[in-house]
Amino acid sequence: MTAETQQRILAAVDEGFDAQLATTQAFVAIPSTRGAEGPCQDMIGDLLRERGYEVDDWHINLDDLRDLRGFGPIEHDFSKARTVVGTYRPATNAGKSLILQG
């Protein structure tokens, strides 16, 4: 990475810091106990869409997972469990992929 590229990245982080802090504060203020993560998932999906990502949002079907190695018993209501994934597709596929999961 060149020094110029590094400086551009640092400047972009500095420029967006207040907005990112406000977004983080809004996110952590949303109650998200097990089984009630929906509002957090909604916010993440909205943020991804605003940034131009293709968003997939689906409910998790435990029957699809039961036979997979490592599956453990679920002892709580999982009927509202969802997964939200954002995908960015560049004009050309010339680089590496990055997955962020949380």
Language model regions located:
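Acidic/His- and Gly-rich active-site-bordering loop/insert found
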Residues: T2-G102
